[in-house]
């Protein structure tokens, strides 16, 4: 044990000596010891203390060993002992002793010491304490004889206590840079020894010339005067507290200095630039490309020369024009704004003058390309004008196109069935025609192309379209009913198109048939019949018996000869769309009527909004055709979309040209739509109007047109109708989702709901209405519009009672004793209180009793007790009126 202990003490002694030498405390201790020995040898107090201590040594009383003896010389025997010390142990004290006789430093010796030297010693001891753990290692000096300080001398002795708190051991984690190498590899490369040595040497020289003062020392020098180092014995306790606080402050200041120095050293060795790269480490930069620091780019003016000549097509947006001129859109907008024209980037320029002026301002000649406009205007010339401009030698006689028009249920379709020897009327929903039928029938007088138009008021557009495309109009009038509204409308369409009119007075087999009434009505409409000396041919017919049908055919053939109907079969085909629909297997199909030229299988067609290539072509008997001559209606497939009923078509060179034409047309439509944005109806908002939103799906395009026309003609000052979408086909899932999002109603006409969309209707709670007859759909929409209106409330008086007395109840409140003066007071009806002809309150009855029994009603002349619901301010003499609220639906 002794060997182990000696070895341990020896190691600690060697370590402590090395640390002391490294900190430079040995020289300072020698200076302090020499200064102290010269003063204490001449003082008589030190000799007296030596005698007292020698006497106490003989007495054998042990003296407490000081923790740190800063005044001992190198010759004094030292013993370094390591021990564990808890936080509850006594605070270590620093006692300054003289080297000669090992006595304590008294107050008389304090003036002999210089303040800067004490400050430097304190700093050096604190620096030494920072290097070594004072909580685990304690230095002690064991003298040859034990010493004990008397109580009287303790008061005169200067004891400087320094509390050293245990320091937490800082564990330095290994630092790895972005290269994956340890920081020690970088220290060897970035550390410059000569620069550090020079700095250290200059620091030592400065320390030798003038001791360094820390933050605590400088603070003490500022706060304390120069002569406060020597104080009387009575102020010793306060001096101890101040010295302890100053030492703590000095310790904190030294810790901050040390942390700053350590941070600076770390930055010097592991300095990184703003992108995380090591500064000065060229080896690691070989594989990493150092990012160049981005500086603020100076505004460079790019001088772009505008082209001298460009060619554009109108209309064009400001953005597109700027791109063609190699300029910014803001430059064009600025130039236009200077001259009083306000435009934005997406505005459309359709004026040739404005476009040419812009080019003149920027030194550019702008030429308007008219080739695109010529493509868009392919269908502007009428078919009749084209036929008139054709060489007469190429023209041949074509079949007449006859349209049967008239009021609903007057027998138009029945006459056509009799001519064709078919039965189409029986298969139609509601026994009315709701589609435009086009077919060719062979008669004894030749072939006739027949158009069967609907007679219902909703199909006004179909009748107008039939009048435009046909050559002769057969006006069917029922002899027992006379001319009706739709008959008059058909006459107006025929007059507007300047078409020959032939009147067929139908139902001549009925007993109430009156032809004179029909003649008179025709004369009133400026259609004077031949029987009355006019030019309008009239024929009495009966679709059931067949009477007069042969005469009708002969009259049609005669009118066709008079008109001299001709066409050019060698020209490219032109015509009109009679009807269109979406077929489940064939896609978009259309019934077209060829007016001029010959339509062949495989040719490319252009409509208003779509194009196509004729893949198949069938007649009314579903027979495949290779070509269609003038006045022939055919059903074609292979279209890109569903064309609208009434749209003209023309044959073009190939499908590529057709695509280019449609693309140009769609672009123009989008620009026009951008110019004519739908503005909100502020009048409807101010008038608090209701709006019914509809989504229409139908089997054919003509049905959509007719249904939409009928719905929009429903006039109402309280409800507006808005059609969000109108398409051909079955009701799909997207339609249901659109209706749910916009809170709209889906109207299906001659169509059905797709299978995968049916469960979505229940989940999203969307209202879907399916119809086969158009007037049923119109009536249902009117009911829906009426349901949107709030009902009108009407108050009907049932009776009245006068309050005769009031009774207070702690549980129920105020009970009113009343006498019924008029009618009947009913318990479940409303009550109003009237005082001086003014209504004070409206509410309901909480209880109605007569002779302590609950009753439902009390009649005139009887007394009752009434308890009102949450009202107790009625007075004697007030009138209680009982009334009933009746709600009446509003009218459109």
From Swiss-Prot:
Residues 200-211, 225-238 have a biased composition (Low complexity). One of its GO terms (cellular component) is cytoplasm. Residues 32-102, 114-300 are annotated as: Disordered. Residues 506-509 are annotated as: G4. Residues 542-544 are annotated as: G5. PROSITE patterns: G_TR_2, IF2. Residues 397-566 form the tr-type G domain. GO terms for molecular function: GTP binding; GTPase activity; translation initiation factor activity. Residues 452-455 are annotated as: G3. Keywords: Cytoplasm, GTP-binding, Initiation factor, Nucleotide-binding, Protein biosynthesis. Transmembrane segments: none annotated. This is Translation initiation factor IF-2. The lineage of its organism: Bacteria, Pseudomonadati, Chlamydiota, Chlamydiia, Chlamydiales.
